[in-house]
UniProtKB/Swiss-Prot annotation:
The lineage of its organism: Eukaryota, Fungi, Dikarya, Ascomycota, Saccharomycotina. Component of the ESCRT-0 complex composed of HSE1 and VPS27. Interacts with the ESCRT-I subunit VPS23, the UBP7 deubiquitinase and the E3 ligase RSP5. May form a complex composed of VPS27, HSE1 and DOA1. Interacts (via SH3 domain) with DOA1. It is found in: Endosome membrane. Residues 393-433 have a biased composition (Polar residues). Keywords: Acetylation, Endosome, Membrane, Phosphoprotein, Protein transport, SH3 domain, Transport. The gene is HSE1. Residues 144-166, 187-212, 389-452 are annotated as: Disordered. Residues 162-181 form the UIM domain. Gene3D superfamilies: 1.20.5.1940, 1.25.40.90, SH3 Domains. This is Class E vacuolar protein-sorting machinery protein HSE1.
Length: 452
């Protein structure tokens, strides 16, 4: 075995290590770099190793190998694409689909990879074997194929409003049927006790069932039916089982939602609405939780007794104690409810952390906008002499900076010194009056034409 083959083998085993719980893209790119050094020989070597890894029983190895295959097809040229689209390799992939020992989750992962490769190879007729394999999977195992993502049609006027209303009606009817079946089951349990009350309830439901639908049909959350991984900046990526909080409808078949602090749009055919609990169900849940919390003292006492017995070595005496048996018998039935409560509060914690992240992002964006607005209103600085250096007017005269106003420090004089002083006399009493030549004779008297 050559040194290059040894390097490829070691790199591939590292990238498809069963201990990896997710794809390590650094390891995958290392394999791609080694293959690109000699696509002819190294390509055959890596495909031989990939085929052996796909025959392993470890699902983790197969998942990592599928990711490596996609990366090789996208980064290592036409020679690797020919090998991946060969009849031998496509038959190996279909064998995983047909195998009864392969879990359905792994089969869906294989189907997703086949679809991705089929879309990548569709422009090359020589690679149509991968497209034929995907068509075969759709015929033989349609349950493995995810629905196509709908196009983003803008909502305009009446036509889009009617489509939105039809979609809302469909969601409302699905929720109403679920609630109706639940009510029928509850009525069947109570029929043996109170038959007249059951008849009255049927009459009330038959009289006005449609009036109760809108109050129960507000879709606030949806659950993902499939995995969706996207590179679009405005789209939301999620995994099967994730609960997405609905924010608004952006397109006809796309809604906007929030998940783990991220916001984006998602296709409606990838999710299903979550039935919001009624007031009665919420009250029952609170009562069950209250029962669990009321047993806290008993649980602590049992825990302390068992710990003390394990330290002293008196386990046999503790097991024979009827009080310990009674406490154990009262605590054990609470385990399913405790498990549900742990999941519930873990989800609430995740929602609160997601909301905190959304608020932090919104606050950061708001502060950035406020800073930009404040900077836009700041007046530009006054240009200094350096700005005018080298500038000339149209007549080639240099442009000089504006001169500063000079302030003289002369002493203050109450009267101007350059006005001639006159000494007229008042015609009434011949007393001399002093004034300045301002256009009338005496400053102390009003000017001519002035009316008091």
């Amino acid at each position: 075995m050559s040194s290059s083959a040894i390097k490829i083998r070691n790199a591939l085993l590292k990238a498809t290590d069963p201990k990896l719980r997710s794809d390590n893209w650094q390891y995958i790119l290392d394999v791609c770099d080694l293959v690109k050094e000699d696509p002819e020989d190294n390509g055959q070597e890596v495909m031989s190793l990939i085929e052996k890894r796909l025959e392993q029983q470890d699902a983790n190895v197969i998942l990592r190998t599928l990711s490596l295959t996609v990366s090789l097809a996208e980064n290592c040229g036409s020679r690797l694409r020919q090998e991946i689209s060969s009849k031998n390799f496509t038959s190996l992939l279909y064998a995983l689909i047909e195998s009864h020992s392969v879990h359905i989750t792994l089969k869906k992962a294989v189907t997703d990879v086949v679809k991705q490769l089929s879309d990548s190879f569709k422009d090359d007729p020589s690679l149509r074997a991968m497209g034929d394999l995907y068509d075969k999977i759709k015929r033989k195992a349609p349950y493995l194929v995810q629905p196509n993502v709908p196009e983003k049609h803008n909502m305009s006027t009446q036509a889009d409003n009617s489509d939105d209303e039809e979609l809302q009606k469909a969601l409302k009817m699905s929720l109403f049927e679920y609630e109706k079946q639940k009510k029928l089951q509850e009525q069947e349990k109570e029929s043996a006790e109170v038959l007249p009350q059951q008849q009255q309830q049927h009459q009330q439901q038959n009289q006005a069932p449609a009036h109760k639908i809108p109050a129960q049909t507000v879709v606030r959350r949806v659950r993902a039916l499939y995995d969706l991984t996207t590179n679009e900046p405005d789209e939301l990526s999620f995994r099967k089982g994730d609960v997405i909080t609905v924010l608004e409808q952006v397109y006809r078949d796309w809604w906007k939602g929030a998940l783990r602090g991220n916001m984006g749009i998602f296709p409606l055919n990838y999710v299903t609405p979550i039935v919001e609990p009624s007031k009665e169900e919420i009250e029952k849940e609170k009562n069950k939780e209250a029962i669990v919390f009321s047993q806290k003292t008993t649980i602590d006492q049992l825990h302390n007794s068992l710990n003390a017995a394990s330290k002293t070595g008196n386990s046999n005496e503790v097991l024979q104690d009827p009080h310990i048996g009674d406490m154990y018998g009262s605590v054990t039935p609470l385990r399913p409810q405790v498990t549900r409560m742990l999941g519930k509060y873990a989800k609430e914690k995740e929602d609160m952390l997601s909301l905190r992240q959304v608020l932090a992002n919104a606050e950061r964006s708001y502060n950035q906008l406020m800073d930009r607005a404040a900077n836009a209103h700041i007046s530009p600085p006054v240009p200094g002499p350096a700005l005018y250096a080298g500038m000339t007017h149209a007549n080639n005269t240099p442009v000089m900076p504006p001169q500063r106003q000079s302030y003289q420090s002369n002493e203050y004089s109450p009267y101007p010194s350059n006005l001639p002083i006159q000494h007229p006399t008042n015609s009434a009493n011949n007393t001399p009056q002093y004034g300045y030549d301002l256009g009338y004779s005496v400053v102390s008297q009003p000017p001519p034409g002035y009316e008091q």
